[in-house]
């Protein structure tokens, strides 16, 4: 068995790579590691999923794995990933399990695991779970009354909506938003949350049938949202992915507001309100150089981490900071959650618009992005290729040619057999040329 956990849990093609048998093994192993019985009595686990078709099969397997290890299951049904993380903490569960492949196509699925308090797992805990799943460490297997039971949480969505309401001090009355729910886990709660806050809401791609999740919609396909915002004369559009742990925006003209621009707007607002701890923002190495420049000009320190909101969260926790995120739209507010929360991000972004009376385009203009080119190269062994001397020499040469006018980032994907090549430069043609040359080198190794 190869390593199961990537940068965001276990993920693969459902029923071939991520099978029901593997899901049961992983869940049983997670229960063994995270929910060993103690003086507090029987342990519980929160289980949720996105609406893709394979979710029902994998949910049954995960529930079987958890209960076979003596853990009671609190099934919250179809809800966003951040809702499962929140409910894991709110319901005092020993762990939480979200069944989702996030922005991936419908045939894929995944398993994300949260520890008590709704926190993502660190590498050491993942290693222990993998050891149990592989059979090198004994798993728990109680009998009789020791086997776990299952119950649903009928008010799970309402609990999450009430939690979101506490994060927005002002009304969104007067704002019109188009929200693209990607036919995913936010199809019910995102429009409800925005309406409850006072916004006029036009919901699109909010009719999941198990097969249409992320299909030409959501945060990876903004075309329908951009068109709808202009057609409805909306103030902005918000796009979520399949499990709603991310949020991207478009302005009234349909232009993209990415995660870096969203973080700029939020960081400046929190700075002005005295809520930005140590005037520090946490972002990943993928954030545009323009974000670094904007934060420096605003007197805000930018701390960078590895890619993945779990690493952003680690950076936030280690420094006690109050805002962090990724260019992809994962934004973390530690005061309100332990993982990226797309719906919360949308609320806070609109809250800043309502507070200032400014259009999102004007607020986002505080950051000017450098042209960025990202090329994904499919390879047989992503780590070996990324560490190849030939590739490393090519990166050094590209960096030398850019000098202070850009940067190069080359890294293996955490979820797929890809090497990602990213080049930023003041001239888009220079960035494109260097990115293509590096991608060619990667492909040739």
From Swiss-Prot:
Modification(s) after translation: Activated by phosphorylation.
Name of the top EC class for this enzyme: isomerase
GO annotation, biological process: carbohydrate metabolic process; peptidoglycan biosynthetic process; UDP-N-acetylglucosamine biosynthetic process
Origin superkingdom: Bacteria
Cofactor: Mg(2+)
Reaction catalyzed: alpha-D-glucosamine 1-phosphate = D-glucosamine 6-phosphate
GO cellular component term of the entry, any: cytosol
Positions that bind Mg(2+): 102, 241, 243, 245
Family membership noted in the UniProt record: Belongs to the phosphohexose mutase family.
Protein name: Phosphoglucosamine mutase
Underlying gene: glmM
């Amino acid at each position: 068995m190869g390593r199961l956990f990537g940068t965001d849990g276990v993920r693969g093609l459902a029923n071939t790579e991520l099978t029901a048998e593997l899901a049961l093994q992983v869940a049983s192993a997670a229960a063994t590691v995270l929910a060993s019985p103690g003086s507090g009595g029987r342990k519980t686990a929160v289980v949720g999923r996105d609406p893709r078709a394979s979710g029902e099969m994998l949910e049954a397997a995960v529930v079987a794995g958890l209960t076979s290890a003596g853990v009671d299951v609190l099934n919250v049904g179809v809800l966003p990933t951040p809702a499962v993380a929140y409910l894991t903490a709110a319901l005092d569960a020993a762990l939480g399990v979200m069944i989702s492949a996030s922005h991936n196509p419908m045939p894929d699925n995944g398993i994300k695991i949260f520890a008590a308090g709704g926190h993502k797992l660190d590498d050491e805990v993942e290693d222990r779970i993998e050891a149990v799943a592989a059979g090198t460490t004994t798993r728990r297997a109680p009998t009789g009354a020791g086997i776990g039971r299952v119950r649903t949480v009928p008010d799970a969505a309402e609990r999450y909506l009430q939690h979101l309401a506490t994060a927005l001090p002002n009304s969104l009355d007067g704002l019109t938003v188009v929200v693209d729910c990607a036919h995913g886990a936010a199809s019910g709660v995102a429009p409800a949350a925005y309406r409850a806050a006072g916004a006029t809401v036009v919901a699109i791609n909010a009719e999941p049938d198990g097969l249409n999740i992320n299909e030409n919609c959501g945060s990876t396909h903004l075309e329908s949202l951009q068109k709808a915002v202009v057609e409805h004369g909306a103030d902005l559009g918000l796009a979520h992915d399949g499990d709603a742990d991310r949020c991207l925006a478009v302005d009234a003209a349909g232009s993209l507001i990415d995660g870096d621009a969203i973080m700029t707007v939020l960081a400046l607002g929190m700075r002005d309100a005295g809520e930005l701890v140590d005037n520090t923002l946490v972002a990943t190495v993928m954030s545009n150089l323009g974000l670094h420049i904007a934060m420096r000009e605003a007197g805000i320190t930018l701390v960078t981490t590895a890619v993945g909101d779990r690493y952003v969260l680690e950076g936030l926790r280690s420094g006690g900071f109050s805002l962090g995120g990724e260019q992809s739209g994962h934004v973390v507010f530690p005061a309100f959650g332990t993982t990226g929360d797309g719906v919360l991000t949308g609320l806070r972004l609109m809250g800043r618009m309502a507070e200032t009376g400014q259009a999102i385009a004007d607020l986002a203009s505080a950051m000017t992005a450098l042209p960025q080119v990202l090329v994904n190269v499919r390879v047989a062994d992503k780590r070996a290729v990324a560490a190849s001397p030939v590739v490393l020499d090519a990166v050094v040469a590209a960096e030398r040619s850019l000098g202070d006018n850009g940067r190069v980032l080359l890294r293996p994907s955490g979820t797929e057999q890809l090497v990602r090549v990213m080049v930023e430069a003041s001239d888009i043609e220079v960035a494109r040329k260097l990115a293509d040359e590096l991608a060619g080198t990667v492909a040739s190794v």
